[in-house]
Amino acid sequence: MKALVKTRPEPGLELVEVPDPVAGPNDVIVKVMRTGICGTDVHIDKWDGWAAKTVHTPLVLGHEFCGEIVELGSEVNDLEVGQFVSGEGHYVCGRCRACLAGKRHLCRNTQGIGYAVNGAYCQYFVMPAGNVWVHHIPDLDPDVAAIFDPFGNAVHTALQFPCLAEDVLVSGAGPIGIMAALVAQFQGARNVVVTDLSDERLELAQQLGLKNAVNVSREGLETVWDRFDMKEGFDIGLEMSGSGTALTSMIDNMTHGGRIALLGTPSTDITLDFSKIIFNMITIQGVTGRQIFETWYTMASLIRSGLDISGIITDRYPITEFREAFDVAGSGHGGKVVMNWECLD
């Protein structure tokens, strides 16, 4: 079969032949239909400092995917060949304190597909049956099914705190930031304000229904307070950018008792004024991945209830044009990029 592989510790990827997978007793094999490109995949493609420290080559990339089950392991009896699925990309140990308490998203021994172990950028992907998510939404677009992983990051972050009737600030209008803002708005937030430095990404946010998109290189958040008759600041902050400047500004603009969820990962050290956090009694909650599988149930319910995230996918390519797809994904413009594997059939 074909797979998209980081063959050597240097920039670039190759679409090459690799052995077909073999299912263990508790595994399934999925015929991959679509895959999304994550920022992690871009880092590995470019072979930056993080990738050089983290990834061992050769490695099959990819953790955003959907496809059809084509084979079941001998001990798998609760899934069926032909089911349309995605998968939870975090493999957990099942034996640590968190796993035994049912908090698998907190497993200290987590391994991520596509960077710690081989991933889903391949025609046929084998994974544990316990990581498979079956899509039961009628007529779900495979492109949307392929991005349930990052959608889950957005949902997990946006729903850290109840946002009904609250004023919500989202810093970072990348795909996950926009999806988080859409979730907050869909859940009944009073005002949702999205900030970024990119007019292109803010325009995409507006096209998807987030009318309060602010370029903070030209407009300060204090003008937003006036626009929405805000007297005390934002109730909830969702920091999606990894920018120290954005986090500092968010803290400055929170109401007393405000709550911040952090998903964006800083690339450098950040200096914070802890006196503001302490005396304003601000709660800061770190977030990674998804709750397994509670977030997946929530995602499916949101889609069934009418939340439309399809517009976040702005570019689609056959896998044979992966180089163009990765160049677009790495440009920092636009939304999600999805690659189609069915062209290899």
Curated annotation (Swiss-Prot):
The main location class comes to cytoplasm
Q: What are the protein's UniProt keywords?
A: Cytoplasm, Metal-binding, NAD, Oxidoreductase, Zinc
Q: Where is the active site?
A: 40 (charge relay system), 43 (charge relay system)
Q: Where does Zn(2+) 2 bind?
A: 93, 96, 99, 107
- The residues listed in the UniProt record as binding NAD(+), with positions renumbered to this chain, are 176, 196, 201, 263-265, 287-288
Pathway as given in its UniProt record? Amino-acid degradation; L-threonine degradation via oxydo-reductase pathway; glycine from L-threonine: step 1/2
Residues of the site described as Important for catalytic activity for the proton relay mechanism but does not participate directly in the coordination of zinc atom: 149
Q: What does the record's cofactor remark say about binding?
A: Binds 2 Zn(2+) ions per subunit.
Q: What is its EC number?
A: 1.1.1.103
Tell where it localizes: Cytoplasm
Q: Which GO terms describe its biological process?
A: L-threonine catabolic process to glycine
Q: Which Gene3D superfamilies match?
A: Medium-chain alcohol dehydrogenases, catalytic domain (3.90.180.10), NAD(P)-binding Rossmann-like Domain (3.40.50.720)
Which cofactors go with this protein?
Zn(2+)
Q: How does it assemble?
A: Homotetramer.
Q: What is this protein called?
A: L-threonine 3-dehydrogenase
Originating organism: Cutibacterium acnes (strain DSM 16379 / KPA171202) (Propionibacterium acnes)
